[in-house]
C-alpha cells in the first residue's frame, strides 16, 4: 500500500517537473519582450492590464483620425465625406452585379470586386491564376508560421523571427479564415502598409508614451493572459475557463466582430464561404453573435487569435456598447431589407444633411454601417432582379392585376378631367382681361405652348419611345462617385434627352435668326417711309403749284371746253377728296416721267375711269387754286395717310392671320369645325400619351399629365379667344370646347387599353404622339408667332416687346419640359385603389 502511494507521488512529481520545465521554456521565451516592455513603459504586469483600455482608446483615435484625414476636413466629417465613405464600403445605394462570378465566390469582397470591374476601376486578366497566386503566398506564410509554432521552446529562433511575428500571425489567421476567398490587390497592399506602421510604432514609442502599443507589448500581455487562463482551466475546469475569458481585459467574446470591423473599414470583409465553417454564412446573426466562429480551435491557436485581435478590441467594445439600445431598430430594418443612404442614416441618428460629424458621433454610426455590410442589403444580382420581376408578373393574383388596371383607368380619367377644366379658366379670364393685356398674355402663352409641346415631344415622348426611360420601377441614383464618373453616368443615362435638347436648340436658333431678319426689314421699311413722307410734305405745295401753272399755260382753250366738271360735283367735301387724291397721283406720275404739255381728248378717253375722274377734279382744283389755304393742305396730308393705312391693312388681312371681321365673314360653323378638328386632334394625342403613360406606371402618367397641363393652358385660352373673336357667345364656346375635350377621353381610353393588353405598342404610341405634338407646335402655332397679326403694329404694339415675350415663353416652356424629363423618375406616388 505504501509502495503504491509512493509510486503515485513520484508520478505526480515527474509530471510537475515536466510541466514546470515547459513553462520555464515559455517564460524564457517571453522574458525578453517583457523586460523590454517594462523598460519602455515602466509598469508592472498588472499596470499594463489596467492600461490596455487607454491603449484601446488610442487605437480607436488613431484609426478614426486616419478615416477623417481621408474623408473629412478640419476634424469633421461632412455629408459628402460620409457619402464617399459609404460608397467605398458599397453602401448608400443598391448596386447590381451583372457579371457571373461563381468562381470568385459570393462574399461581400467578391461583390465589390465585380462592381469595380464593371465600373472600370479594376481588371482581371487571369482570375484563376490570380486566385492561386494569393493562396500560394498565404500558404507559404502559413507554413513558416506553423514551423515557428512547432519550435516554441527554441528561444534563439523565436528571437530572430520576433520583428515579423505579429505580421505573420495576422496573415496566418486570415489564411485560416479566408483561404476560400478571392481578394483584391490593393487590399493586401493596404494591410501591408498597416503592418509596417505597427512596426514603426514599436520603434517610436520611446518618446511617445501616449501612442498605441507595439505588437511585442501586445504579445507579452496576451501570453501572460493565456498562461493564466490555462492554469485556471486546469484548476477550475472548462466552466471556470470560460468565465475567466469573459473577465479578461482583451474583450474576447466579440473578437470576430472586431475583425469584421477592421476589414469592413477597407473592403467589407465580413463573412466567408468556407466549407469548414458553414456557420459563417448566417445573415441573421447580429454583431455580438459572430464571436462564436472560432470556439472549435485548439488552445494554441486560440492564443494567437487573441493576440491578432488585440488591436481591434476597443472598436468591438465601443460597437457593442453603442449598438445595445439600437438592436431592436436594426432587426426591424433587417426585416424590411432597406439599403440606407446617407440622408436616411443620418436621419435615424437625429442628424441632418448639413450636420458635421465629429469623431465621437462617428463611433455611433459604426454599428449601423457594420449591420448594413453584414446584411448585404446594398448588393443585388442582375439575374435575380430579372427573375424576381418575371416571377412578380407571373405570381400576381388576378385581383392584383385588376387593381393595377383599375388604377390606370381611374387616374387617366381624373387627369383628363382636370386638364379639361382649364376651359373654365379660359372662360373666366378672356372676358375679364383687357384687350391690350390679353394680346400680351396671348403672345406669351402661344410661345409657351410651342415651347412645352415641342419640348414634350423631343425631351419626353421620343426618349420614352426609344426605351430611354422605364416607368415600371423607380431608379435610384447615387451621388457618392467622383465628378468625372457622375458626369459620365449622367451623359449615358440622359443621352436621348440631351439629344432632344440639342434639337430644340436648333429650332430656337432658326427662330431667332428669322425673327431678327423680319425685324430688320420692318425697321428699314419704316425708316424709308418716314423719310419719303417728310420730303413730300415739304415739297408738295411748291411742286403742285408749278405743275398747275404749267398746265394752265400750255393747255389750249378748246381743251378746257372738254374738261368741264360733271353735274353734282360742286360739293366742297367731295371736291376736297378728289383734289387730294388727284394731286397725289399726279405727283407720283411727275416723278416717274417728264411732264407733258397737255392731254388731248382722244387720249383722255383711253385712260382709266379713275384717271378721268381725276382730270375733272384737276379742273376744279385749277379753277379754285387761289382759294385754298394751308389748312386745306394739312387736310390733304391727313387724307393721304388714311388712304395708305387702308391699303396696308388690306394687304395684311390676306396673310395667314385673320382679323375679327375676316373670322366673322368666314362663318361660325366653319370656325367651330376648325376648332373641333384642330383642338380635337391635339386633345386626342394628349389623351393617348396620358393613357399609355398611366398603363406603364403611375409616375410616368403623372409626369405626362403635368406636361400636358403646362401646354394646355395657353392652347385653351387661344381657342377661346378665337371663338369669341369669331362672334360666338360664351355658351357656344364652352360647348365646342367640351366637344373637343371628348377626343381626349377617347385617346386616353385607347392608350390605356393598348398599354394594358399590348405592352409592345406603348413605345410606338409615344412616337406617334411626339409626331402630333411637333406638327401642332411647329406647323400651326410657330408661324403665328413669326408672322403675327397686322393689327398689333397699328395699335402701338412694339415688335421688340413681342420678340421678348415670345423668347420668354419659348425658354420657359423648354425649361419646364427639361425639368420634368430629368426628374420624372424621382417623382414617386403610391396610390392604390
Curated annotation (Swiss-Prot):
Annotated InterPro entries: ZIP, ZIP_Transporter
Gene Ontology annotations of biological process type: epithelial to mesenchymal transition; intracellular zinc ion homeostasis; negative regulation of B cell apoptotic process; positive regulation of B cell proliferation; positive regulation of B cell receptor signaling pathway; zinc ion import across plasma membrane; zinc ion transmembrane transport
Predominant location: membrane
Glycosylation sites: 191, 198, 218, 341
Transmembrane segments: 413-433, 440-460, 497-517, 689-709, 734-754, 761-781, 803-823
Compositional bias segments (type: Polar residues): 137-147
Tissue and organ distribution: Expressed in the liver, kidney and brain.
Positions of modified residues (Phosphothreonine): 538, 555
Bias (Basic and acidic residues): 30-48, 152-167, 200-209, 281-315, 326-335
Disordered as annotated region, ranges: 30-54, 137-167, 200-257, 271-335, 466-485
GO MF entry, a single one: zinc ion transmembrane transporter activity
Entry superkingdom: Eukaryota
Signal peptide segment: 1-25
Disulfide bond entries: none
Keyword terms: Cell membrane, Glycoprotein, Ion transport, Membrane, Phosphoprotein, Signal, Transmembrane, Transmembrane helix, Transport, Zinc, Zinc transport
Induction summary: Greatly increased in liver and brain, in response to Zn(2+) deficiency (at protein level).
Statement: the UniProt record of this protein carries the keyword Phosphoprotein: yes
Record function comment: Zinc-influx transporter. When associated with SLC39A6, the heterodimer formed by SLC39A10 and SLC39A6 mediates cellular zinc uptake to trigger cells to undergo epithelial-to-mesenchymal transition (EMT). mediates cellular zinc uptake to trigger cells to undergo epithelial-to-mesenchymal transition (EMT). SLC39A10-SLC39A6 heterodimers play also an essentiel role in initiating mitosis by importing zinc into cells to initiate a pathway resulting in the onset of mitosis. Plays an important for both mature B-cell maintenance and humoral immune responses.
Assembly and oligomerization: Interacts with SLC39A6. This interaction triggers cells to undergo EMT and mitosis. Found in a complex with SLC39A6, SLC39A10 and with the 'Ser-727' phosphorylated form of STAT3 throughout mitosis. Found in a complex with SLC39A6, SLC39A10 and with NCAM1; this complex controls NCAM1 phosphorylation and integration into focal adhesion complexes during epithelial-tomesenchymal transition. Found in a complex with SLC39A6, SLC39A10 and with GSK3B that controls NCAM1 phosphorylation.
Name of the protein in question: Zinc transporter ZIP10
The species this protein was found in: Mus musculus (Mouse)
Phylogenetic classification of the source organism: Eukaryota, Metazoa, Chordata, Craniata, Vertebrata
